[in-house]
């Protein structure tokens, strides 16, 4: 069959159907979303939960959500900007912070649904691959990873968040092939290297190296770390302490009372107020007129 030229006449435009808004904006992959959200037909009123991970320039977002016709419902969320509460006051977008954010999300949600004591997760960090096993009467909470439009690169921070969630006690179907430390050629997984990455040892090593080579650049580049008492010697211990603090109290901080917004426009008066305002103006004008006549 030869080339068929599309004739863009009135009938073409009349029948033309635009794609969905978020597809036109390049924000949602609906091919993937359909497979992440559609539940089996023999399961009724059982939502399929998604572990949503998004990376920004200044933050790491981790959420547990399920979809409804009206839109997605977020049941739990954790952010890297919450980590200063647990002792991590700098480096909130690195690999170690991504793991801590995932751990915070898992422990927070399990505490909310009353499974934190049953499924404690992998309490001793070894870097080994960990999958939750069913214990007691209630099955572990299950969620599938949703990475949006990000690339599934081996060693990505997205999988650090997933590792934190899995170690926190939530069942996330995965394999070790995308973790840091996995060799694509030999198919071997170096758990020790992954553990060092999670505890920020690579950052500590670079801090030591940079301090020896160029101290001025070291002070400039790691100024936030140094001002908060984080250096190459105590960095690994700081991350370990943060993990312990997260497990001790994963609950979100209390919201501050919202301040009343400043009003930049005049408040609308009621009918009685407008009537009284006119009467006051009339009285003032009459008073001024009497003063002039005197």
UniProtKB/Swiss-Prot annotation:
<comment type="subunit">
    <text>Component of the large ribosomal subunit (LSU).</text>
</comment>
<feature type="region of interest" description="Disordered">
    <location>
        <begin position="247"/>
        <end position="275"/>
    </location>
</feature>
<keyword id="KW-0687">Ribonucleoprotein</keyword>
<keyword id="KW-0963">Cytoplasm</keyword>
<keyword id="KW-0539">Nucleus</keyword>
<keyword id="KW-0694">RNA-binding</keyword>
<dbReference type="GO" id="GO:0003735">
    <property type="term" value="F:structural constituent of ribosome"/>
</dbReference>
<dbReference type="GO" id="GO:0006412">
    <property type="term" value="P:translation"/>
</dbReference>
<keyword id="KW-0699">rRNA-binding</keyword>
<dbReference type="GO" id="GO:0000027">
    <property type="term" value="P:ribosomal large subunit assembly"/>
</dbReference>
<dbReference type="Pfam" id="PF14204">
    <property type="entry name" value="Ribosomal_L18_c"/>
</dbReference>
<feature type="compositionally biased region" description="Basic residues">
    <location>
        <begin position="256"/>
        <end position="267"/>
    </location>
</feature>
<dbReference type="InterPro" id="IPR005485">
    <property type="entry name" value="Rbsml_uL18_euk"/>
</dbReference>
<dbReference type="InterPro" id="IPR025607">
    <property type="entry name" value="Ribosomal_uL18_C_euk"/>
</dbReference>
<protein>
    <recommendedName>
        <fullName>Large ribosomal subunit protein uL18</fullName>
    </recommendedName>
</protein>
<comment type="function">
    <text>Component of the ribosome, a large ribonucleoprotein complex responsible for the synthesis of proteins in the cell. The small ribosomal subunit (SSU) binds messenger RNAs (mRNAs) and translates the encoded message by selecting cognate aminoacyl-transfer RNA (tRNA) molecules. The large subunit (LSU) contains the ribosomal catalytic site termed the peptidyl transferase center (PTC), which catalyzes the formation of peptide bonds, thereby polymerizing the amino acids delivered by tRNAs into a polypeptide chain.</text>
</comment>
<dbReference type="GO" id="GO:0008097">
    <property type="term" value="F:5S rRNA binding"/>
</dbReference>
<dbReference type="GO" id="GO:0022625">
    <property type="term" value="C:cytosolic large ribosomal subunit"/>
</dbReference>
<dbReference type="Pfam" id="PF17144">
    <property type="entry name" value="Ribosomal_L5e"/>
</dbReference>
<keyword id="KW-0689">Ribosomal protein</keyword>
<dbReference type="GO" id="GO:0005634">
    <property type="term" value="C:nucleus"/>
</dbReference>
<comment type="similarity">
    <text>Belongs to the universal ribosomal protein uL18 family.</text>
</comment>
């Amino acid at each position: 069959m030869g080339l068929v030229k599309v004739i863009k006449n009135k009938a073409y435009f009349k029948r033309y159907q635009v794609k969905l808004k978020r597809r036109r904006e390049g924000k949602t992959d609906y091919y993937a979303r359909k497979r992440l959200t559609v539940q089996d037909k023999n399961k009724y009123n059982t939502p399929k939960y998604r572990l949503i991970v998004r990376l920004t320039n200044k933050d790491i977002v981790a959420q547990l959500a399920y979809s409804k016709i009206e839109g997605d419902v977020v049941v739990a969320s954790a952010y890297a900007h919450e980590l200063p509460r647990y002792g991590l006051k700098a480096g909130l977008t690195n690999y170690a912070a991504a793991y801590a954010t995932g751990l915070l999300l898992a422990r927070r949600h399990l505490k909310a649904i009353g499974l934190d004591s049953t499924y404690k997760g992998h309490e001793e960090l070894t870097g080994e691959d960990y999958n939750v096993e069913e214990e007691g009467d209630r099955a572990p909470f299950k969620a599938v990873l949703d990475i949006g439009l990000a690339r599934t690169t081996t060693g990505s921070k997205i999988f650090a968040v997933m590792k934190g969630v899995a170690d926190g006690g939530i069942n996330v179907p995965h394999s070790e092939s995308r973790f840091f430390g996995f060799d694509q050629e030999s198919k071997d997984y170096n758990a020790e290297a992954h553990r060092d990455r999670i505890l920020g040892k690579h950052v500590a090593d670079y801090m030591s190296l940079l301090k020896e080579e160029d101290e001025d650049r070291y002070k400039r580049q790691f100024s936030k770390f140094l001002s908060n008492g984080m250096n190459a010697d105590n960095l690994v211990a700081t991350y370990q302490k943060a993990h312990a603090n997260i497990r001790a109290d994963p609950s979100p901080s209390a919201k501050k009372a919202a301040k009343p917004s400043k009003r930049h426009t005049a408040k609308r008066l009621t009918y009685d107020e407008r009537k009284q305002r006119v009467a006051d103006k009339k009285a003032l004008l009459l008073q001024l007129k009497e003063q002039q006549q005197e």
